[in-house]
UniProtKB/Swiss-Prot annotation:
It comes from Vulpes vulpes. It comes from the Eukaryota. The gene is MSTN. Acts specifically as a negative regulator of skeletal muscle growth. This is Growth/differentiation factor 8. GO terms for cellular component: extracellular space. Synthesized as large precursor molecule that undergoes proteolytic cleavage to generate an N-terminal propeptide and a disulfide linked C-terminal dimer, which is the biologically active molecule. The circulating form consists of a latent complex of the C-terminal dimer and other proteins, including its propeptide, which maintain the C-terminal dimer in a latent, inactive state. Ligand activation requires additional cleavage of the prodomain by a tolloid-like metalloproteinase. Keywords: Cleavage on pair of basic residues, Cytokine, Disulfide bond, Glycoprotein, Growth factor, Heparin-binding, Secreted, Signal. InterPro entries: Cystine-knot_cytokine, TGF-b_C, TGF-b_propeptide, TGF-beta-rel, TGFb_CS.
Amino acid sequence: MQRLQICVYIYLFVLIVAGPVDLSENSEQKENVEKEGLCNACTWRQNTKSSRIEAIKIQILSKLRLETAPNISRDAVRQLLPRAPPLRELIDQYDVQRDDSSDGSLEDDDYHATTETVIAMPAETDLLMQVEGKPKCCFFKFSSKIQYNKVVKAQLWIYLRPVKTPTTVFVQILRLIKPMKDGTRYTGIRSPKLDMNPGTGIWQSIDVKTVLQNWLKQPESNLGIEIKALDENGHDLAVTFPGPGEDGLNPFLEVKVTDTPKRSRRDFGLDCDEHSTESRCRRYPLTVDFEAFGWDWIIAPKRYKANYCSGECEFVFLQKYPHTHLVHQANPRGSAGPCCTPTKMSPINMLYFNGKEQIIYGKIPAMVVDRCGCS
């Protein structure tokens, strides 16, 4: 009994010397550790976001087969951009980003962008295009985007200046050919007739698919065309060489080519917002702003939701392949572990100038992260 009392006295003495225990200190330390963990997660996500933006810039140039971003200023874009109905419809109405994630899928498509529409502007005329010492409009050069795809539709768009009184307009589209023995330099393509009323000018489209297909088969036969739109008094109403106040009224070709459908496979994933404390693999929002890059050569969209993946990957969590966990169990030291990566991506539609100042409307694959997983 006496021995027990001695032990109790010693214990009380130790408590007095050590002083009171501050339980709040442990909770404060725990809170600091949690805050530090959250801070590290935020920093990691910010670094991942920055890397994703840089990767997107590189991917876009690579997928569009551009070595560098086209050097086209905002003012130049305003001058080159046709004020024509088909282009305005693309800018105002087309779906800049597909939201119809029909099947969760990782696109099984080619790496490069798929062209759907090309707006070809007239190129500068050369000596072959000059008749009687005068340049004629118009001569069009065609990129590989048209040459190696099936042409579905080809429309020549011309702008007719306004008239003061009702009149009938005779449109002539003439194809320039090599001089024949009798001196003939032209052959007719189309000669539509239309009625115009006083008011604003109008855009008129003419089907030139057959002519374009012939040019693609025999490029040497492409010497250009001449455009005329004569009213009843013989005045030419067609804008071929725009004057003051006629920017964006140049003739142009609208060419539509085929697009190949892609196969898909299913997958699943989880989403989080930027304020989430979740440390596991998730998809986070990311908006890419092309104007912030100074990429004025991209006509539309000016920005799009790209998203990115970030987070830790525990084994058997959102794994893309079921055998990943088995491989790690068989050889835990030889496996680096799964990584948080996109498992479903979708394309975006883009309207842009290429290096030849042609306007392209096409689809760029795998630019939007729809789902994330561990693989």
